[in-house]
């Protein structure tokens, strides 16, 4: 049996199974976001750290990503521009992408940041403050973070201890966030407005806490394209590592379009 015949034989069966699974577990009702191109936002952690393939892209992969957007004249915007459009209820009529990096690993500062800077590509670094305060090897220092800001980089909050937010009490999480605010004020003189959930995890209670602390937008780690219909407290990002940082996957994500979630059940975890 050739490949096409196998596909025709087995695909309908898998389609039926997928339909049954979706109806059973309550996957959200989805439609295309009308007349919007959207923003594909990417998330990196490490660069060229082969010991950590689940959180690192190879240098060759990163170079291929940059080469693709330069050669194809892809519009790259900052996370602040995304937030501005969301706050003003503007549609994303032009196809764009955006870049972010979590955790402030030294490989970002030493390898990736010079490349972002060379091509004037905006990028936001989400920082968990405790690991920086402790001068841990393999992470950036506050001096390097300040240099990154001075050279045009953008900073975001990522909690103090990189905790699993929904698994802890509201009181504990609030204390953690306030500790990170104190560290930011001490070391860079301001508290960043942008926020990203460690591990991409949140809950309705956590979102309410962010609102109490005047954090108005937050990014997760789930794949998807941002549109004007997006939940401001659960903005999607395409996560990139060795397995999911191939040229094919990156180019597919760059050229993806937004889907509008009309109904989501259950509402909380």
What does each model-identified segment do?
Residues 80-87, 127-129, 196-201, 222-225:
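Short, solvent-exposed turn/loop segments enriched in Gly/Ser/Thr/Pro and often Arg
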Residues 1-11:
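N-terminal secretory signal peptides that target proteins for export/translocation
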Residues 37, 42-52, 93-97, 105-205, ...:
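Metal-dependent polysaccharide deacetylase catalytic core of the NodB/CE4 family, i.e.
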Residues 15-27:
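Bacterial N-terminal signal peptides
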Residues 29-97, 244-269:
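N-terminal pre-catalytic segment of deacetylase/amide-hydrolase enzymes
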Residues 213-222:
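Catalytic-core region of carbohydrate-active enzymes that cleave or remodel glycosidic bonds
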């Amino acid at each position: 049996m050739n490949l096409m015949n196998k596909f025709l034989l087995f695909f309908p069966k898998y389609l039926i199974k997928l339909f049954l699974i979706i109806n059973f577990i309550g996957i959200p009702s989805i439609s295309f976001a009308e007349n919007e191109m959207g923003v594909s936002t990417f998330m990196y952690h490490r660069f060229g750290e082969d010991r950590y393939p689940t959180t690192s892209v190879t240098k060759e992969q990163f170079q291929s990503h940059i080469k693709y957007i330069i050669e194809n004249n892809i519009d790259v915007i900052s996370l602040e521009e995304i937030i501005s459009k969301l706050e003003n209820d503007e549609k994303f009529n032009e196809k764009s992408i955006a870049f972010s990096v979590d955790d402030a690993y030294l490989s970002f500062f030493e390898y990736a940041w010079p490349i972002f800077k060379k091509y004037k590509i905006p990028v936001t670094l989400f920082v968990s403050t405790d690991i920086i305060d402790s001068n841990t090897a393999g992470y950036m220092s506050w001096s390097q973070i300040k240099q990154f800001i001075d050279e045009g980089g953008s900073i975001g909050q990522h909690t103090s201890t990189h905790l699993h937010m929904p698994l802890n009490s509201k009181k504990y999480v609030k204390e953690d966030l306030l500790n990170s605010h104190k560290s930011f004020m001490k070391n860079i003189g301001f508290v960043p407005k942008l926020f990203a959930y460690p591990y991409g995890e949140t809950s309705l209670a956590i979102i309410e806490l962010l609102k109490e602390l005047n954090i108005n937008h937050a990014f997760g780690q789930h794949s998807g394209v941002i549109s004007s219909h997006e939940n401001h407290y659960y903005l999607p990002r395409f996560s990139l590592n060795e397995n999911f940082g191939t040229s094919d996957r990156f180019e597919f994500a760059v050229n993806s379009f937004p889907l509008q979630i009309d109904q989501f059940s259950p509402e909380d975890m």
